[in-house]
Amino acid sequence: IHNQTVAYYRLLDKLRADFPDIEWESCASGGGRIDTGVIEHVQRCWTSDMTDALSRQCIQRWTVQNIAPEYLGAHISQPTSQQTGRTYSVAFRAATAVFHSFGIEWDITKASDADLQELASWIVWYKANRDFLHSGRFVRLDVADPAVLAHGVVAADGSRALIAHVQYE
């Protein structure tokens, strides 16, 4: 397995050198099994095939124990999760993705005009705040209520913070 892994790293390095305008993403192999050594060879890792925004909150909370948030692929998925059948607003799906490598995984040709406008607003917000989100100190807050997750980013100089409070159950 070691030789296969080293060969994979060499392949990624060659692809990055040959195609510098492409961002390469590693797979989590079903979630929770990111090869931490691959970070040196890719721009991000796909965190999990579970794209349900509420489920991703917990997955992402613990994955950032080992991988910096900006390296974790996190996308706004379709309104109704294929895995759980739960439906979420654009705001919740976007708020779940913005702390990480923000993207869109949703057939927006099927989105309403209102959802498209809200999505556009989130994209503008993310672009304006990306440097702060990816250069600050990521924090996980311990909350006594097991149905609540809280995490956020604090600017390096302490001048600013953004905290997410998630009602998990």
Where are these regions (language model features)?
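Carbohydrate-binding surface patches
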Residues: 143-169
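Glycan-recognition surfaces
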Residues: 2-109
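Generic hydrophobic alpha-helical scaffold/packing signal
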Residues: 9-16, 120-123, 164
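Short amphipathic alpha-helical patches
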Residues: 38-39, 50, 120-121, 142-153
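A glycine-rich phosphate-binding loop feature that marks nucleotide/adenosyl-phosphate handling sites
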Residues: 26-34, 112-116, 139-147
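Catalytic cores of secreted or luminal carbohydrate-active enzymes
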Residues: 91-140
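A broadly tuned, weak detector of single residues within folded domains
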Residues: 17, 90, 119, 156-157
